[in-house]
Design a protein with these regions (language model features):
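Conserved helicase motor core of SF1/SF2 NTP-dependent helicases
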Residues: 1-136, 141-149, 154-184, 195, ...
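C-terminal/domain-terminus segments
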Residues: 215-234
Length: 234
């Protein structure tokens, strides 16, 4: 066991069943440390995303990850959060934003557009096509293609990185997903649903290196209030 090295981020646990190292005979309590230098995400995006989770995140083994004190090595524009009146307005806003990134000379494969589930993919396709941006919809292989923007659900976005990310359809009852909330009766299970939905939005936000746009059709997700607080502080 002394030859094993593990790296992870408790904030990126997006599936409901918690994973326990201890149950596999690996006890990392007192043998771990938190890394506080972020080389991938701008200060502005990291600050926004971290406020979704709070200052500490714990796992089922009792390990706590301290999120305060982390610093990014570069700055960027503040994340943009827009709540629109209908799908058409959202599509137009996202298309304009995508065109701006292309006009800056950003390659298409440096752009990602993500939604909560397949149901909302129509909105992402419409915005990308309105911007005349070539794209590919990611499958379970999660392979990006040079010259094409990537469209996918937030779950498939985990592990990817883009210079610019648009998160669409962050509406009420979409994130957190209403069907998941209604499927549980126990308060502990309900808390776990909310936590994993928050983590999912965190993962989606932190796919962005430099530019982040988050849009919803009113009423927006309750999580957007946390994001707006973060944006106001940057």
């Amino acid at each position: 066991m002394n030859g094993l090295f593990f790296a992870g981020d408790l904030g990126q646990r997006i599936f409901q069943l918690p994973f326990s190292w201890k149950s596999l005979g690996v006890d990392i309590r007192g043998r771990s440390r938190t890394l506080h230098i972020n080389y991938r995400t701008s200060h502005q995006i990291r600050m926004q995303a971290d406020l979704l989770l709070g200052p500490d995140v714990s796992d089922v083994d009792g390990n706590t990850e301290e999120r305060r004190g982390t610093v990014s090595v570069f700055n960027g524009p503040a994340p943009a959060i827009r709540s629109l009146v209908d799908d058409d307005e959202e599509i137009a806003v996202v298309a304009t934003w995508l065109k701006a990134r292309m006009n800056e000379g950003m390659p298409a494969h440096e752009i990602g557009i993500f939604v909560r589930s397949e149901v909302e993919m129509t909105r992402a396709r419409a915005a990308t096509e309105a911007a005349a941006l070539p794209y590919r919809v990611l499958d379970e292989k999660v392979e990006t293609t040079v010259g094409f923007a990537s469209l996918s659900t937030m779950h498939l976005a985990k592990g990817l990185e883009f210079r610019a990310v648009s998160l669409m359809a962050c509406d009420d009852e979409i994130i957190p997903l209403q069907s998941r909330i209604e499927s549980v009766a126990d308060s502990a299970d309900l808390e776990e649903v909310y936590n994993t939905e928050r983590h999912l939005l965190y993962v989606a936000c932190t796919r962005a290196r430099d530019h982040l746009l988050i849009t919803s059709v009113e009423p927006g997700s309750e999580f957007l209030e946390d994001l707006r607080v973060a944006s106001a502080k940057t």
